[in-house]
């Protein structure tokens, strides 16, 4: 069950600030069948014939169109595009035969046994699932075992226990980008993987000696005691969640320029929760009822990891850091967060006509500054059933109700470093993600610039003000239903990294005061169009639609805009917009280039010429700079929805479901990588990494302007709307055919 009601989310607290999903379990059977087994098998095929593979000859011909006529291409092309007799690059492409898996199998097998009576019952379940990926020999396997026990040792007292264990193993993809990011080491990127079958086979044979084991084990459970006596109810419970993540990776000398690499990573995340509740109901005359609920909880979250990396071992026989002569570096860290909350909920109900509730809650956390550990978060709701109170005799209306709720919910900060106060924090002498706080041994000087950013005193709780109101209805003896709701979600007091002068030694300053507002509407319709139980026919349909608008409402210190991490945050604009230059084509001649005060338009001091892009000069200074960038498009869809239908005939059923998203855009990174070859071929960075599927056509538009590859203005830079594409879609999510035994 998806929980979206702000009032219900407020009962769960900050962990549900982004929403929550209830997983409802059932008790053990009380008589009747007590053993169940179910299984499913799905096979899918990747159509390799639809992959339009290319080779070096195709790439050479593509690049030739970007140079002036008569240019000696071999002066500018990389080595792998020069020798047309090289069979590895100019031969028939065939890499897709090994890359795409055919067929792919997905299966699930589950079994359970249950039993017992009213005073004691149990449920024991086991299951396994496997999902083979579409490409790169990826797969996923999962094993789980669950045990549920309910007992009533004395009247009114129930004891409930849940134990769940899960193991997940995953075979990762072999992309070069992921490997280089893990190693933090770049070999030469001058030559990509060859596209031919023999070249692909050779590379895969090198990977046969590699290792990339990924295992995740999770164990969680709870013990709850609940007592009910007349109008009094009480309970206490303990819950735990323990998860381990282990990854062992090794890449041999054959794929890293005669150097090997190994890493061992182990981590655990541990959560422990103890909570209680005490409730009492008061019934008045004429159907009026009051309920009081007092709740409290304490929670501890602990995150711990050990990470060891080894470079340049003696040979490829030792695949771990425990031996083999590796140059080893070790990293470890632990973070502990504590949470506490208490709340009082008062509910009111008048028969089936009206219900209302208010909640007063305090949350405390250790990840904010000590002076601001506590946050008060109230909530309220109201439900009015028009059918029961005003329209009892209207037969064609089955149900009609108005509802509304509001809540303030705190948001946990992702780390306790924000509550530590001023710090000189850098990762320049560590590894990516391993932060070092300079405090002695001249670290505060040696680690400049401080890439994490300045944090001052007084970091407080971020929080969200959520509101929802709408109407629920059912018609014609519940055969038709229509629900509509309007919502507002205002995230306030958010941290944002703002730019500061470089002389401070920081690359930014974290400040609170950013506010982001999301508003929208959700509509759902459902109906049973045909219902003939005597003949066994039933046809039902359902549809849903949602619209969302996000907006930056404020920035710290009254700022109206700020540029951070390549994005422009501007008050009154959506936060998911792209910050790009507007591209209006190509200058066909030098005479087309605008001239102001006797000087031609420039880009970083370089004059534009024929064959260069027409970027829009927004501020009219005859210079193309970041000040000419505009906000365009949205990375998140504005409209989402779906449609489903199900046709039943006796024991058979046929169903289909569709999903759509519209109003979003995306930057075609693949096109950028293809067109900006003159820049990316020269640099050793992740943007220049060419995966095996670089040798594939069809994903890159061929109608872009052909700019001069020798231009000094970087014509195919990434931050322009040339690559911005609308990516709305309608997707067939599933088609199912079933038979009930």
Residue ranges of each PLM-predicted region?
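Periplasmic plug
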Residues: 1-6, 38-44, 51-52, 123-125, ...
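Periplasmic N-terminal gating module of Gram-negative TonB-dependent outer-membrane receptors
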Residues: 1-3, 12-18, 29-38, 514-519
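Residues embedded in well-ordered regular secondary structure
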Residues: 19, 27-136, 174-176, 204-213, ...
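Extracytoplasmic gating/loop element in the C-terminal half of outer-membrane beta-barrel translocons
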Residues: 85-86, 365, 608, 661-740
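N-terminal plug
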Residues: 1, 6-15, 45-49, 438-441
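Conserved C-terminal beta-signal and adjacent last beta-strands/turns
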Residues: 112, 538-542, 634-662, 717-741
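Conserved small-residue
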Residues: 36-87, 417-419, 425-430, 434, ...
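Extracellular/periplasmic, surface-exposed regions of secreted and cell-surface proteins
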Residues: 142, 148-167, 197-251, 261-578, ...
């Amino acid at each position: 069950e998806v929980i979206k009601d702000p009032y219900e989310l407020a009962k769960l607290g900050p962990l549900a600030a982004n929403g929550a999903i209830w997983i409802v379990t059932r008790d053990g059977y009380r008589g009747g069948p007590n053993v169940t087994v179910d299984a499913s098998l799905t096979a899918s095929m990747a159509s390799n014939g639809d992959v339009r593979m290319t080779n070096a000859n195709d790439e050479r011909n593509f690049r030739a169109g970007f140079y002036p006529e008569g240019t000696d291409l071999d002066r500018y092309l990389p080595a792998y595009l020069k020798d047309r007799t090289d069979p590895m690059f100019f031969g028939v492409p065939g890499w897709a035969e090994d890359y795409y898996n055919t067929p792919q199998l997905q299966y699930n097998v589950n079994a359970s046994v249950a039993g017992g009576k009213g005073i004691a019952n149990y449920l024991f379940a086991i299951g396994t699932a496997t999902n083979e990926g579409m490409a790169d020999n990826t797969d996923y396997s999962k094993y789980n075992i669950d045990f549920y026990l309910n007992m009533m040792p004395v009247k009114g007292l129930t004891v409930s226990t849940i134990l769940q264990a899960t193991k997940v193993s995953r075979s990762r993809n072999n992309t070069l980008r992921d490997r280089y990011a893990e190693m933090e080491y770049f070999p030469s990127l001058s030559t990509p993987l060859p596209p031919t079958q023999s070249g692909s086979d050779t590379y895969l044979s090198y990977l046969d000696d590699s290792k990339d084991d990924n295992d995740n084990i999770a164990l969680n459970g709870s013990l709850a005691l609940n007592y009910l006596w007349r109008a009094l109810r009480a309970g206490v419970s303990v819950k735990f969640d323990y998860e381990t993540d282990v990854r062992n990776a090794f890449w041999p000398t054959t794929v890293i320029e005669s150097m090997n690499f190994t890493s061992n990573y182990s981590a655990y995340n541990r959560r422990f929760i103890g909570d209680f509740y005490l409730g009492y109901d008061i019934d008045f005359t004429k159907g009026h009822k009051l309920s009081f609920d007092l709740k409290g909880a304490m929670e501890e979250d602990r995150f711990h990891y050990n990470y060891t990396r080894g470079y340049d071992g003696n040979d490829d026989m030792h695949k771990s850091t425990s031996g083999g002569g590796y140059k080893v570096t070790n990293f470890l860290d632990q973070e502990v967060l504590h949470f506490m909350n208490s709340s009082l909920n008062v509910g009111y109900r008048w028969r089936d006509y009206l219900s209302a509730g208010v909640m007063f809650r305090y949350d405390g956390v250790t990840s904010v500054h000590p002076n601001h550990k506590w946050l008060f978060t109230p909530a309220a709701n109201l439900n009015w059933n028009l059918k029961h109170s005003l329209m009892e005799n209207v037969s064609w209306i089955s149900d009609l109700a108005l509802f509304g709720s509001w809540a303030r919910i705190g948001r946990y900060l992702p780390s306790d470093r924000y509550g530590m106060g001023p710090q000189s924090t850098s990762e320049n002498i560590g590894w990516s993600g391993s932060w070092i706080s300079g405090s002695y041994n001249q670290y505060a000087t040696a680690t400049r610039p401080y890439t994490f950013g300045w944090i001052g005193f007084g970091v407080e709780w971020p929080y969200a003000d959520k509101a929802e109101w709408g109407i629920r209805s059912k018609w014609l003896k519940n055969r038709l239903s229509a629900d509509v709701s309007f919502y507002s979600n205002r995230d306030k007091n958010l941290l944002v990294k703002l730019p500061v002068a470089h002389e401070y030694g920081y690359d930014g300053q974290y400040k609170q005061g950013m506010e982001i507002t999301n508003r929208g509407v959700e509509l759902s319709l459902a109906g049973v169009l045909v219902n003939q139980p005597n003949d066994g026919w039933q046809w039902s349909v359902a549809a849903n639609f949602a619209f969302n608008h996000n907006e930056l409402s404020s920035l710290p210190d009254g700022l109206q805009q700020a540029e951070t991490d390549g994005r422009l945050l501007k008050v009154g604009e959506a936060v998911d917009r792209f910050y790009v230059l507007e591209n209006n084509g190509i200058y066909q001649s030098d005479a087309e280039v605008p001239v102001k005060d006797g000087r031609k338009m420039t880009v970083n001091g370089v004059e534009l010429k024929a064959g260069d892009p027409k970027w829009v000069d927004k501020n009219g200074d005859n210079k193309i700079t970041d000040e000419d960038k505009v906000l365009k498009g949205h990375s998140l869809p504005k409209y989402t929805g779906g449609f489903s239908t199900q046709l039943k005939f006796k024991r058979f059923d046929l169903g289909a479901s569709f999903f759509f998203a519209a109003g979003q855009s995306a930057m075609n990174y693949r096109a950028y990588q293809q067109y900006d070859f003159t820049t990316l071929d020269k640099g050793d960075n992740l943007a220049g990494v060419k995966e095996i599927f670089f040798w594939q056509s069809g994903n890159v538009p061929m109608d872009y302007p052909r700019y001069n590859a020798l231009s000094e203005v970087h014509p195919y830079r990434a931050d322009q709307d040339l690559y911005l594409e609308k990516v709305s879609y309608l997707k067939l999510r599933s088609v199912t055919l079933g038979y009930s035994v």
